[in-house]
């Protein structure tokens, strides 16, 4: 399929990665972006277009820079470990400029429909209808990469909150929240304790008279900052920790995580402890919530049973009067209306092989990129998905039979149903390392730790015990990057660089302790490599 045209729908993080992957494989990408700029979710707008992903002005990303970068383009070392949304967008602009991606994007262009050509069973081609400034055009493409994300359509379940129609105060979805000023001096209820709900409750509590955070189940709250000040995802995302989880089981892993989170504050005492285990729900990442709760600025409440004109009555019988505003941080739903019947979404559930390919197509020339909710960054997963999809489009990689794909999809869905609480939020979950390793295997770029243990033991040890960063998948195989080894071995330097803005007496106690721990674990490396890899 070399030299063939591929339509890329959306110019957010996934779309940019797809354009670059197409170029690397000799394909001709044409990216359609409905707005006038790149960035998708991460481009803040005070008044976003309908159907476009939207964030609030203060958003800080929940994954650290080393874990979220594109695999052959590290984020500058002076950038903070957890970046403001404007810095995330700046990084995307740098990436697009570095690899010359902008010239392949048609801005202000909406994709109206993507239909199979009459000869699709033999050609695998698609007819893509677009509209730009009132003018419609149709073009034929040999492949389609859908990168529209899953934070576009606000999920607002008003039917679950009787009386909301007579509530005299203001109510809105978190998508429409931008800053806290308009809630100054007011009594506000935030419904939902995901990442957005927690962030909004904290931010509004600095100006509001009182904030109530309503939750049906409670939540486990994870801090961005882990032991010794390292980013929490850096500490938790190693192949060794994944290995320990596999051999000890989820029960032990749950107990470990819950103990760590309860060491920071007692979730039961703060009214947050859920009935489910830590790994049965996407944890809420929030650094400030316990501080706002202990100061009384945020009060945790149960689920709202009903609203009156001015009050909220909760399921435990308690009541809060004189409520001025209600913010529904109740998540999002996703759909692909332009695909018609090619990809069906029912209750936020979709059947995709490896969360990428529809299993029912005669030709594998359509892929959904970035439709996953990992405990970790989406960007590197999207990039690996794009690398795999372009190889499939070219015929260099093949998919199993339809029946085999459907069997695996069913098995994955059953596994997810057993692990996670039933929620619209938990239909596209995926473990970060497991997903990355699985797709890397399919692409042929998963590092061979056993081989490296003999040829480059220092690197092998870092790959096993250090954070599983996206750069690991540029060490070998197709798309190998010469700077990968050095970037992997200097990850700690880039973590420390933005923090060390004041000269102090050097203290190597933490580093020495971490190094000693690595050497202690190194003696078990060969045995683990033989068993696990």
UniProtKB/Swiss-Prot annotation:
The keyword Lyase does not apply. It catalyses: N,N-dimethylaniline + NADPH + O2 + H(+) = N,N-dimethylaniline N-oxide + NADP(+) + H2O; NADPH + O2 + H(+) = H2O2 + NADP(+); heptan-2-one + NADPH + O2 + H(+) = pentyl acetate + NADP(+) + H2O; octan-3-one + NADPH + O2 + H(+) = pentyl propanoate + NADP(+) + H2O. Keywords: Endoplasmic reticulum, FAD, Flavoprotein, Lipid metabolism, Membrane, Methylation, Microsome, Monooxygenase, NADP, Oxidoreductase, Phosphoprotein, Transmembrane, Transmembrane helix. It comes from the Eukaryota. It is found in: Microsome membrane; Endoplasmic reticulum membrane. The modification Dimethylated arginine is found at residue 5. Its EC number is 1.14.13.8, 1.6.3.1. The modification Phosphoserine is found at residues 54, 58, 280, 401. One of its GO terms (cellular component) is endoplasmic reticulum membrane. One of its GO terms (molecular function) is monooxygenase activity. Gene3D superfamilies: FAD/NAD(P)-binding domain. FAD binds at residues 10-14, 33, 41-42, 62-63. The modification Phosphothreonine is found at residue 284. The modification Phosphotyrosine is found at residue 56. Acts as a Baeyer-Villiger monooxygenase on a broad range of substrates. Catalyzes the insertion of an oxygen atom into a carbon-carbon bond adjacent to a carbonyl, which converts ketones to esters. Active on diverse carbonyl compounds, whereas soft nucleophiles are mostly non- or poorly reactive. In contrast with other forms of FMO it is non- or poorly active on 'classical' substrates such as drugs, pesticides, and dietary components containing soft nucleophilic heteroatoms. Able to oxidize drug molecules bearing a carbonyl group on an aliphatic chain, such as nabumetone and pentoxifylline. Belongs to the FMO family. This is Flavin-containing monooxygenase 5. The gene is FMO5.
């Amino acid at each position: 399929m070399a030299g063939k045209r591929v339509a890329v729908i959306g110019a957010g993080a996934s779309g940019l990665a797809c354009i670059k992957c197409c170029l690397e494989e000799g394909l001709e990408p044409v990216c359609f972006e409905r707005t006038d700029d790149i960035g998708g979710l991460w481009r803040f707008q005070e008044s976003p277009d309908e159907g476009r992903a939207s964030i609030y002005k203060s958003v800080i990303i929940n994954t650290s820079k080393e874990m979220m970068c594109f695999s052959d383009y590290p984020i500058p070392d002076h950038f903070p470990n957890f970046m403001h949304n404007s810095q995330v967008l700046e990084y995307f602009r740098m990436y697009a400029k570095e690899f010359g991606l902008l010239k392949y994007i048609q801005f202000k262009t909406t994709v109206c429909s993507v239909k199979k050509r009459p000869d699709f069973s033999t050609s695998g081609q698609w007819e893509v209808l677009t509209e730009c400034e009132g003018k419609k055009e149709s073009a034929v493409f040999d492949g389609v990469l859908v990168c529209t994300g899953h934070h576009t359509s606000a999920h607002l379940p008003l039917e679950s909150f009787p009386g909301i129609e007579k509530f005299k105060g203001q109510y809105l979805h978190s998508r429409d929240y931008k800053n806290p000023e308009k809630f100054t001096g007011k009594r506000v209820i935030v419904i939902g304790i995901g990442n957005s709900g927690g962030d909004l409750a904290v931010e509004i509590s600095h100006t509001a008279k009182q904030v109530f955070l309503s939750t049906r189940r409670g939540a486990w709250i994870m801090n961005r900052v882990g032991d010794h000040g390292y980013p929490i995802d850096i500490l938790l995302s190693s192949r060794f920790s994944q290995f320990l989880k596999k051999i000890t089981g989820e029960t032990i892993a749950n107990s470990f995580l819950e103990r760590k989170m309860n060491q920071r504050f007692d979730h039961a005492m703060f009214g947050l402890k859920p009935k489910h285990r830590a790994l049965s729900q996407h944890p809420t990442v929030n650094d400030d919530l316990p501080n706002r709760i202990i100061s009384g600025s945020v009060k945790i409440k149960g689920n709202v049973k009903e609203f009156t004109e001015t009050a909220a009555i909760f399921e435990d019988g308690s009541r809060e009067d004189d409520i001025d505003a209600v913010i529904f941080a109740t998540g999002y739903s996703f759909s692909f209306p332009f695909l018609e019947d090619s990809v069906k979404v029912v209750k936020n559930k979709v059947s995709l092989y490896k969360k990428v390919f529809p299993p029912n197509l005669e030709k594998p020339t359509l892929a959904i990129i970035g439709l996953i909710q990992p405990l970790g960054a989406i960007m590197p997963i999207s990039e690996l998905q794009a690398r795999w999809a372009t190889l499939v489009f070219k015929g260099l990689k093949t998919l199993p039979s339809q029946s085999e794909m459907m069997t695996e999809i069913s098995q994955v869905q059953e596994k997810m149903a057993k692990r996670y609480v039933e929620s619209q939020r938990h239909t596209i979950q995926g473990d970060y390392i497991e997903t990355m390793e699985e797709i890397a295997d399919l692409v042929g770029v998963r590092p061979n730790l056993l081989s490296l243990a003999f040829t480059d033991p220092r690197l092998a040890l870092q790959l096993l015990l250090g954070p599983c960063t996206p750069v690991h998948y540029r060490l070998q195989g197709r798309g190998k990057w010469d700077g990968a080894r050095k970037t992997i071995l200097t990850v700690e330097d880039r973590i420390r660089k933005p923090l060390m803005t004041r000269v102090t007496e050097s203290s190597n106690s933490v580093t020495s302790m971490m190094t000693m721990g690595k050497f202690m674990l190194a003696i078990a490396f060969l045995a683990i490599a033989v068993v696990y890899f």
